[in-house]
Amino acid sequence: HDKNTATAFADTVRDLPRTPGRRTSVSSALEIGSLLIEASEKDIVATRKVIDVSGDGPNNDGNPMMETHDRIVAQGIIVNGLPIMDDNANGYYPDLDRYYAGCVVGGRGAFVVVVRKYADYAAGMRHKLILEISQNESLIKEASTAKKPLLTKIAAGPAAGPAAQPEVLRPTNGYPGGCDIQNGFGGFRRF
């Protein structure tokens, strides 16, 4: 697609209404992402399949997290994460980065980009996209030689926002409090 399509999509996402709530279903996001990838495979041959998960809370609704995670990763899908850890937010989780590393991300080359303030989200997303693209050398070469201006501009442009280099974590094996959180605002308890 072209720059106008990307800009229109970004505008649509930016203009979506925010709905504060106490429920987060990371497992449902993974399931929907997997279904969308599966549906697109009729028309597109992908060299990599990646689901990006951004959020400010753990899985406290929907199906069990690790069961869903393991099924998605077994399909060859990479899951990367961008936890938003703003300590001024309602329902702040001080170790959400470790939760994402232990329960959300997975697959070959998976990673977590940590954002510490909502204001730094755009910079974190940009950093994450560059990491995802740069993990595939042929894609970088194609972007620069095929004159795909949007990808080239993103990769070459200056850092957006104050957080130029967000913290990046690799996957770990589980989370001490469990990956399914009941009553997320009341504490980390297994279902």
PLM regions and their residue ranges:
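DG-centered beta-turn motif at the end of beta-strands
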Residues: 33, 47-62, 104
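VWA/integrin I-like adhesion module and closely mimicked acidic/polar interface patches used
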Residues: 57-102
